[in-house]
Amino acid sequence: KDLVRYEPGVSVGGAGQRGGISGYNIRGIDGDRILTQVDGVEIPNGFFNGPYAKSQRNYVDPEIVKRVEILRGPASVLYGSNAIGGAVSYYTLDADDIIKPGKDVGARLKSGYSSADDSWLKSATVAGRSGEFDGLLHYSQRDGHETESFGGNNGTGLARTAANPEDVRATNVLAKLGWNYNDDSRLGLTYEKYKDDRDTDQKSAYGGPYFNGAPTIPSSVLPGGMYQWRTGNDTITRERFGIEHSFALDSLLADNVKWSLNHQIAKTDQSTEELYYPITRKVLRTRDTIYEEKQWVFDAQLDKAFAIGDTDHLLTYGTTIKQQKVTGSRSGDGTCVAVGRGCTAIGATSAADVLAKASDFPDPTINTYSLFAQDQISWNDWTFLPGLRYDYTQLKPHITEEFLNTVNADGQGTVSDKNKTWHKVSPKFGLTYALTDNYTWYGQYAEGFRTPTAKSLYGRFENNTTGYTVAPNSDLEPEKSKGFETGLRGNFEQGSFDVAVFYNKYRDFINEDAVKPGDDQLTFQSNNIKRATIKGAEVKGRLNLDAFGAPQGLYTQGSIAYAYGRNNDSGEPINSVNPLTGVFGLGYDQDNYGGLLSWTVVKKKDRVDDSNFKSPDGVSSQFKTPGFGILDLAGYYKVTDDVTVSGGVYNLTDKKYWLWDDVRGYDSVGEASVTQPANLDRLTQPGRNFTINLIWDI
């Protein structure tokens, strides 16, 4: 979240939810529609299908990141499927980022504390160079607890407003080895392993399940509810092996060649343990969910510079070949802790609570083959940027015994193992015109697409306890988008600014929360929204006040982001669009110290589609977040050339507020009522909190 705290039109959600952050939101598009990658390798999608199966996207440690690139709007020309709404690219540290000029060895030690989650960071990076070889080794560990809410009620169930207690440990290892065997040639090896392990006492679920703001079984009949207590463990791991090779090639076809091969294994293990007491029996019940993605990615990129007449060209072209294998399962057990129906003795197995290993989708293998080309053409004050990409995607479902256990549980439904294939040509055209040395106008048209997931095509789940079913839809069409953007950039001695206006059209938008009409019970089946639009504007700028006689180093900056979304099929708003947001700051920078006072202002959320909303608190409509304004103060001080202290105090006025990304859609279906009922105060952001970091560059 800190990476995009001041970025217009970009946010991160996930407060109060099990598993951590849910991913990026860019211009009203979020989740798996935003491609997130580390060194060109995509991190897994999020997954939710049933009360104990919800994965988030906590796969990246910011301590290894040297640079982040955020691409707003459709980006399929560069990245293919899943970049329909934008892309976030992380680039990891290299030896040159740690070794100081003129030296062959370097190190960076860092320690930090955050009061919002009572977490301590310990990080160490060492790097060295010898002749043609260089290497880097990094290890970081963050130990903390739950991120606080503004609520102070430490009770249980719907009454609880404090965050659920958590113990969190996140670790990351990064190792790199490079061989510069020529001036323009390099061979590199990379190994990375990230792990996020958190234990949660889900006190907000005690006493459930809930319906219309009260326990399903009244507390006068069953004190403590069916769920007497519940704890959970979420372990997220991501391991990557990579090789990268770049070299100069003085030929007619290319000046430079760069290729890479990466293998990544990412896995989410979720385990839930609860004391289950449905009056007739008392059982210690466990539920285990596994979601895993394995992928191989080969990328090759070539570039060639040449001139034709008065135009200069930089042609970039290449290919991407990717294979993803996705597996998932859920299972459970029940052990009697008292004699009752189905429990003949303490310690015996409760057959009614045993969940045979099952899967909600057939394990897919997804093969993607891509070709792309882009030409940067410079002519006088004009720059043209045409691009084209072709993607062929094949999804092969693999019918497993675990999936058959789900499909055949009630003897209904058919199973299809038919392959799905999609072809897509994605064009892009951009141009810029230098009006003067200081001002540049630009325009862009780009297309994007996203293929349906195996879960939406084949996924099945039935929960008779809470009365809902998830049904497959094998007729889903891929999502498609067309994005138009124009803007003006200015850069001059007194400051800079960037103004952008965008209009994005979406076809066949996949709604995974759609309610299937005509069924006796609540049935969710993904469908295509034929047409949707999101339009908006963003402004970002900085003014150097010292150019107008103020003290040297004093500046002001600001950004405003506005977006408007509409489901053109129903006329309803698109809930993933955030309210109008502005961030304004006054800063002061010197060679060895500086600070920034920021004021974040967010308008109340007034356009909401709550036609399918159900709340465990008994509220009939979606909660609309009120507007708010908060102050943050951050600063740094270089004690010596090698030692820097930085920190900040956030929410200075200790204000209670909600972020729309955290609140929207947190309804009674699935996780909200069964595993974590949502008292709205528990979804608030922390009150006044601070961070402090000490960095020593050796």
Question: Where are the regions a protein language model picked out?
Answer:
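Surface-exposed extracellular loop regions of Gram-negative outer-membrane beta-barrel proteins
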Residues: 195-197, 203-204, 267, 394-408, ...
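Gram-negative outer-membrane beta-barrel transporters
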Residues: 378-384, 393, 496-510, 517-610, ...
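C-terminal beta-signal and adjacent terminal beta-strands/loops
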Residues: 46, 449, 502-507, 554, ...
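Periplasmic-side early beta-strands and strand-to-turn transitions of outer-membrane beta-barrels
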Residues: 96-97, 104-110, 114, 121, ...
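Flexible loop and strand-edge segments within Gram-negative outer membrane beta-barrel domains
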Residues: 184-252, 266-278, 284-292
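Signature of Gram-negative outer-membrane beta-barrel scaffolds
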Residues: 312-436, 462
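Outer-membrane beta-barrel signature, preferentially recognizing the C-terminal barrel domain
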Residues: 219-250, 360-366, 416-426, 430, ...
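Acidic, small-polar-rich N-terminal luminal/periplasmic segments of exported/outer-membrane proteins
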Residues: 1-100, 204, 486
